[in-house]
């Protein structure tokens, strides 16, 4: 696996800040084990990020060898001891190879990150409404989630301060005041707001925990109810478990909606135009030979040829992504041009 300092070409296929602390009989073995474990973990994170939550699809992809999809890794820091390896690394996975595996498995995925979405948790109990108070379990669970999540939907939370509390008081936020929600979205630079309510209801003989999640646009208009649940507080309800379960359900709904709206479209066009720079006829014939060996190309025809450049029309029997993957295995890169269906063939630079 090559070590590089460059930026990963596709952020969706990058995992950064991976902490390694592994032990083995030798320092070298500890390094091998640590990096292998980190690669498996990072690959799982990428798959969880780009595919719609689905246990079967996840298992299909994670059954593949993670190290075969690695483009490069970058070591931020490391300390190699006699029987221990401590490091922090970033791993970049090869987008074309992962896409190829997804296509072969017949799976759908997305790669586009969302603009910021504000999480706005509200907690209500007999003593009052809490939005900006610290050390409230409901509020803390959402803060922890916002800090740790690393999927395609990018969430944000407002950091409590005196000025914010005065401009966004708790009671109007509880009532979903449209202007207050819009002001909160503006303060966070968010395009949407997830209003997250949890409260204790003592109006019945058995108290209840009520949880509700609603999605609003940046103007404070309701878009959808994304979660709703009531639980009896009969002495058997664990608030930590209840909050985490509701949180997972709500986030799955939002993630699925984003994925469905931004599914990666496999380019299944019938033909593409490929241009390539050459220095001799030998180069030209070599390129044509390599292209003719790619499984996704059914036929090739010459469009133009000069002393320095050639152009070929390729009739495809598969997707452009499959052709790109096949060429990559031969040391070439097929780069999309400015015009639709136009590509440039280049030697990969290692």
Language-model features: locations:
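Amphipathic beta-strand/beta-sheet edge segments enriched in Tyr/Trp
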Residues: 8, 14-17, 188-239, 322, ...
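Short, well-ordered alpha-helical segments
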Residues: 18-62, 180, 238-249, 253, ...
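N-terminal segment of the mature soluble domain
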Residues: 35-58, 115, 121-179, 287, ...
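Signal peptide-directed extracytoplasmic domains
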Residues: 51, 55-121, 131-137, 174
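A short, hydrophobic beta-strand-centered structural micro-motif
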Residues: 67-77, 159, 172-208, 212-214, ...
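Pro/Ala/Gly-rich low-complexity, hydrophilic intrinsically disordered segments
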Residues: 86-121, 219-221, 225-269
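C-terminal soluble interaction/assembly domains
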Residues: 219-236, 245-249, 270-350
């Amino acid at each position: 696996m090559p070590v590089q300092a460059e930026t990963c070409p596709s952020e969706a296929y990058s995992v950064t800040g991976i902490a390694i602390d592994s032990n083995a009989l030798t320092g070298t073995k500890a390094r091998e084990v640590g990096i292998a474990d980190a690669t498996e973990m990072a690959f799982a994170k990428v798959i969880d990020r780009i595919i719609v939550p689905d246990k079967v699809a996840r298992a299909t992809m994670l059954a593949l060898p993670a190290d075969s999809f690695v483009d490069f890794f970058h070591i931020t820091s490391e300390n190699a001891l006699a029987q221990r390896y401590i490091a922090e690394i970033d791993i970049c996975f090869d987008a074309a190879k992962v896409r190829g595996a997804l296509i072969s498995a017949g799976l759908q995925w997305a790669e586009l990150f969302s603009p910021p979405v504000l999480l706005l948790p509200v907690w209500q109990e007999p003593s009052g409404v809490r939005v900006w108070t610290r050390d409230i379990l409901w509020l803390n669970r959402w803060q922890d989630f916002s800090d740790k999540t690393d999927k395609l939907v990018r969430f944000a939370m407002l950091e409590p301060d005196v000025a914010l509390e005065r401009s966004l008081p708790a009671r109007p936020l509880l009532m979903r005041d449209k202007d207050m929600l819009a002001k909160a979205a503006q303060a966070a630079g968010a395009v949407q707001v997830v209003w997250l309510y949890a409260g204790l209801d003592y109006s019945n003989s058995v108290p209840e925990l009520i949880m509700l999640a609603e999605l609003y646009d940046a103007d404070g208009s309701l878009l959808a109810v994304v979660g709703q649940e009531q639980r009896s507080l009969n002495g058997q309800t664990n608030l930590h478990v209840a909050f985490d379960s509701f949180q997972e359900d709500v986030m799955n709904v939002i993630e699925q909606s984003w994925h469905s709206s931004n599914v990666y479209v496999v380019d299944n066009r019938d033909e593409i135009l490929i241009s390539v720079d050459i220095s001799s006829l030998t180069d030209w014939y070599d390129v044509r030979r390599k292209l003719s060996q790619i499984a996704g190309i059914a036929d090739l025809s010459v469009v133009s040829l000069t002393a320095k450049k050639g152009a070929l029309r390729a009739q495809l029997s598969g997707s452009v992504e499959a052709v790109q993957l096949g060429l990559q295995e031969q040391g070439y890169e097929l780069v999309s041009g400015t015009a639709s269906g136009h590509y440039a063939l280049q030697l990969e630079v290692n």
